[in-house]
Design a protein with these regions (language model features):
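Intrinsic disorder/low-complexity signature
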Residues: 79, 145, 239-241
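Serine/threonine-rich low-complexity intrinsically disordered regions
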Residues: 3, 21-24, 32, 44-45, ...
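Short linear sequence elements within intrinsically disordered, low-complexity coil regions
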Residues: 16, 30, 56-57, 173, ...
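Compact mixed alphabeta submodule
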Residues: 116-234
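Compositionally biased, intrinsically disordered low-complexity regions
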Residues: 22-23, 37, 66, 223-228, ...
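Extended acidic low-complexity intrinsically disordered regions
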Residues: 2-18, 235-254
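OB-fold ssDNA-binding interfaces and closely related basic DNA-contact patches used
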Residues: 1-142
């Protein structure tokens, strides 16, 4: 006979451990708040490396649960979901076009940044629009390399939430250059850099293929050849903001 008291203790132990692990993982990220957040973007430890890591994420819903899939095309490999995405756009069906939008791989960029409010090195996870504003600084003679530790610039992330999605159009560097911090602070920050490249864990081709075949079954006029065994019917949903931070981060370990 099952000892329910012992089973309940084990259940609490497992759920608390899982919850704690996810909380620890999320604590590494800088979650931008509505209004202004001041950060100092940090360079890579090695000069020949980029200060950011780039990925593209298919965020898919299956049985009411969302999961992130890092697209193989980031590494130059083939992606069944991207093949389906382009195929759906070649049809005349608006439903197919909506499905294409829901499975689209959306660019994501990870950067190491000092959160000025706390002084901690965090992972800044941003979409293409905000990343583009950061890159603009490098090609602007008034700013240049804003990650320079001696004469770079702090960056103001201004997050407005008036419409359906967050707006970052007012984000910009501070007007004057400055040292990132004291020598001791800089040394500590550079020793605390997160392994942002390790966040990009490319999804397995076979898993993506099964997902693509399952989505194809819901499309109109795609000529799909039967159900995929063991694959639940996915739901397309609506197009999502590439700045949906919390939902993105909670699934990032998957």
């Amino acid at each position: 006979m099952v000892n329910l008291d012992e089973l309940r203790k084990k259940y609490e132990e497992v759920t608390q451990r899982n919850s704690g692990g996810n909380k620890d993982f999320l604590s590494k990220f800088l979650i931008t708040k509505e209004g202004t957040s001041i950060v100092r973007l940090l360079p890579a430890k090695n000069e020949d490396e980029n200060f950011y890591a780039e990925t593209a994420i298919h965020r898919l819903e299956n049985d009411g649960q969302f999961k992130n899939y890092h697209c193989p095309r980031v590494k130059g490999d083939k992606c069944p979901l991207c093949d389906l995405y382009y195929g759906l756009w070649k049809t005349d069906s608006e439903d197919n076009h909506n499905l294409a939008r829901s499975i689209k791989a959306r660019k994501r960029y990870y950067l190491n940044a000092v959160e000025r409010e706390t002084g901690d090195v965090k992972i800044l996870s941003i979409g293409m629009k905000l990343f583009g504003k950061i890159l603009d600084c490098f090609f602007d003679d008034d700013y240049g390399d804003i990650t320079d530790l001696e004469k770079g610039f702090d960056f103001k992330i201004v997050k407005d939430i008036n419409g359906a999605f967050p707006n970052y159009d007012k984000s910009a560097p501070k007007p004057r250059p400055s040292e990132a911090g004291s020598g001791a602070e800089i040394a500590a920050w550079m020793d605390s850099l997160h392994d942002i490249k390790n966040l990009v864990k490319i999804a397995e081709y076979d898993e993506l293929k099964q997902m693509a075949m399952a989505y194809e079954l819901t499309a109109q006029g795609m000529g799909s050849a039967g159900a995929v065994q063991g694959t639940s019917k996915p739901s397309g949903g609506q197009e999502k903001s590439d700045d949906d931070y919390l939902s993105h981060l909670k699934n990032l370990e998957s």
